[in-house]
Amino acid sequence: MAKRKKKEVFDWEDEDQEEIIWVSKSEIKRDAEDLKQLGEKIVNLTKANLAKIPLDESLLDAIELAQRLQKEARRRQLQYIGKLFRGIDVEPIREALDKIENKHNQQQAMLHKIEKVCDELVEKGDVALTDLLNDYPDGDRQQLRNLIRSAQKELEQNKPSKAYREIYQMLKVLMLED
């Protein structure tokens, strides 16, 4: 006579068992579509920008192949790239892509910051200069101090601010080095 296996009964009331997280099929499809779109953004990058993104060898080969393909073959390759993304952590890739895409915004923000610092230097003088040189010790204190005084005189006399532009250029070189 054959032995019967005892059926394992799942106790829904037992809190010691692992919590099961159910994911809907629609959510899985949305995630897959997001990864496919991420792959498409990466495929559309130039080679120089592509080198800035941390990709493993198989993924890089798949992306380079997708850049050469057209129409339906490209669509299938993008599906494959999305599948490869499902097996890895994509956060470092997304962060690198965001840096590349937002480079213009970052530069604009930095230029606005430089302009704000320049305005503070002309308004507050030596106090603002000391704060600036604490943050950026490579700055030329004497030259900046002379330019600040010249800019303040030009401002008082309502002359075109040649010294202000020179301060701006010095700060741009100083702050964009970092």
Swiss-Prot record:
The lineage of its organism: Bacteria, Pseudomonadati, Pseudomonadota, Gammaproteobacteria, Pasteurellales. Member of a network of 50S ribosomal subunit biogenesis factors which assembles along the 30S-50S interface, preventing incorrect 23S rRNA structures from forming. Promotes peptidyl transferase center (PTC) maturation. GO terms for molecular function: ribosome binding; rRNA binding. Belongs to the DarP family. One of its GO terms (biological process) is assembly of large subunit precursor of preribosome. Pfam families: DarP (PF04751). InterPro entries: DarP, DarP_sf. This is Dual-action ribosomal maturation protein DarP. Keywords: Cytoplasm, Ribosome biogenesis, RNA-binding, rRNA-binding. Gene3D superfamilies: PSPTO4464-like domains. The keyword Cytoplasm applies. It is found in: Cytoplasm. SUPFAM superfamilies: PSPTO4464-like (SSF158710).
